[in-house]
Regions:
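Acidic/polar loop patches that form or flank catalytic/metal-binding clefts of enzymes
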Residues: 214
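Membrane-proximal interfacial segments on either side of biological membranes
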Residues: 1-97, 101, 108-211, 223-241
Length: 241
């Protein structure tokens, strides 16, 4: 039988950067941070062939910020309010509640909330993402892989709800996605893709059963392209092996 409780020894937001693999966070020793980051939780119960300990892990950050010394911009207004919970001791009953995940770079803001249940079984997802982000500012505030060049303005407001059994059985009537996404003056270039992919305008409308591509125009290398159309069963397309 297990009965354990824990809490991060300090509330310094640098604790959050420390849990990100160094490949993505780089050297954090000289990163300037403000605000807090706290992880606390408890495990209790029996462990046998059918059970794991019951647990409740809370992850919280309020109005935090961080700035890398060699980059011109900071990530600020960081809010994290997340719980990872299992009340039964049955592994399939594990769920994640992301009540709030948000941050700002300059005046651009990203927001997300989600509920993910039956994490190790028939995973169910109910999520909302909205925000406006100048993608060029990402590399000005956070270390990105060498050779990566990302530009464009992304505006999105999308809701999605689905379960994995419905996706696997192609029962797309049980899924729901709606909202809008617009991407303008997008450019992507990396070491793997040396010829930039450019999208002058992309507008998509998400409906419960279809995605309407209202406008798409761009170029790659010396090739120009444009398109409009409809995608049926987007989630099935995304998760198709």
């Amino acid at each position: 039988e297990i009965d354990i409780s824990f809490k991060t020894p300090s509330s310094d937001f640098k604790n959050f950067l420390a849990v990100i693999p160094e490949t993505y966070s780089k050297n954090i020793e000289n990163v300037k941070t403000t605000g807090n980051f706290v992880v606390e939780g408890e495990f209790n119960g029996v462990v046998d062939e059918e059970h794991i300990p019951k647990f409740n892990i809370k992850i919280n950050s309020e109005n935090a910020s961080f700035k890398y010394p060699d980059l011109p911009k900071s990530v600020r207004n960081v809010f994290i309010d997340t719980e990872i919970i299992n009340k039964s001791g049955i592994v399939e009953d594990t769920r994640v509640d992301i009540e709030r995940l948000s941050f700002m770079i300059d005046e651009d803001k990203f927001n997300m909330n989600a509920k993910i249940s039956e994490l190790m079984g028939n995973t169910k997802v109910d999520a909302h993402i909205d925000g406006r982000m100048n993608l060029a500012n990402i590399e000005k505030a956070y270390p990105v892989p060498p050779g990566l060049n990302l530009k464009g303005l992304l505006v999105a407001d999308v809701n999605t709800a689905f379960d994995m059994n419905s996706i696997e059985k192609k029962q797309y009537a049980n899924t729901k996605t709606n909202g809008n996404l617009k991407l303008s003056d997008f450019e992507y270039k990396s070491e793997e893709i040396p010829n930039p992919v450019k999208l002058k305008t992309t507008q998509m409308t998400f409906n419960p059963k279809t995605v309407t591509l209202n406008e798409l125009s761009g170029s790659t290398g010396k090739t120009d392209f444009s398109a409009t159309g409809t995608i049926n069963n987007l989630l099935g397309f995304m998760f198709n092996d």
